[in-house]
Amino acid sequence: MDIYIDRLNERDAQALFAYECNNRRFFEQTVPGRGDDYYSFGTFGIRHKELLKEQEEAISSFYLIKDGSGIIVGRINLVDIDPVNGTAHVGYRIGEAFTQKGIANEALKLLVKLAPDLNVTQIQAKTTSDNIASQKVLVKNGFERISINEEISADSGQKLTFFHYSRNL
């Protein structure tokens, strides 16, 4: 499937909200949930504006992964951009109907190519120990696992094991 990454903007709010609602249960199988409030359009709209502000301030850079028709099939982001140290953290999620098509792999390749334009020279990532698909995407894109730790999820209170990865550009 041909995809491209498109920088998040105001006009994407409705389509992104629908994408998040449609994939909520699927996402919550492998990553901590975002809480019920996130799935109210009012709250979502506020959060969307906060993300755009972060992006304006160059703290983060958010992208929608779209297919050739412009349909949102996933998200990929660089957050906690540190221009002094050249570091950022990557996160991504692919909609349920679009998994196992190589989309996360291709989107991460595209993001890695544009990261130097944001003065990022090292990308860090973390994923839960049971998210094998994400681990494979990271390794396939040249990330190395650098540590493992356990954290308590703020939303669910459950103990999760995280694998931490890094890639120098």
Residue ranges, per PLM feature:
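GNAT-family acyltransferases
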Residues: 1-89, 158-169
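A short, internal acetyl-CoA/4′-phosphopantetheine-binding micro-motif in the GNAT/acyltransferase core
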Residues: 66, 91-100, 128
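Conserved G/P- and acidic residue-centered "switch" motifs that form tight phosphate/ATP-binding loops
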Residues: 70, 102, 131
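Conserved acetyl-CoA-binding loop-helix of GNAT-fold acetyltransferases
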Residues: 94, 100-113, 136-140
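Conserved GNAT acetyl-CoA-binding A-motif
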Residues: 117-127
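Conserved beta-strand-loop-alpha-helix junction that forms the acyl-donor binding cleft
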Residues: 125-135
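Conserved catalytic-core motifs of GNAT/GCN5-like acyltransferases
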Residues: 126, 144-161
